[in-house]
């Protein structure tokens, strides 16, 4: 998993319309060459490069990723695993997350408010591998329980944030 993201909540960076345009374009095609990105945003390539670098440096852009199909790399079974932690384990949340996100099965980790503490998006080779992963979670002393839901289909939202 990626390193701890920059926390942009404390001091929200000011975004102007050009920044929003760049973000919209990059969400559509993160591999777009800088020259094309600049032309489509109506700014000079050097300005474009500087703005993208600034948006990355301040944590607005968290990275540029390949969207890999888990089934194409031998992990066709996807599931959402809701995890509830023991009340006395709340102080170990960062340690728990650090351990869990190192597992190859884990695609995403969501920290929740509500009945469950975490929602894990996982991909495994088969039901046996999923069962082993869930059993490993339940064997951890800080885990009170888990609930697993299989994912039949996943569609990424098509609308950019901006």
Give residue ranges: language-model regions.
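A compositional/biophysical signature of low hydrophobicity enriched in polar/charged and small residues
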Residues: 1-162
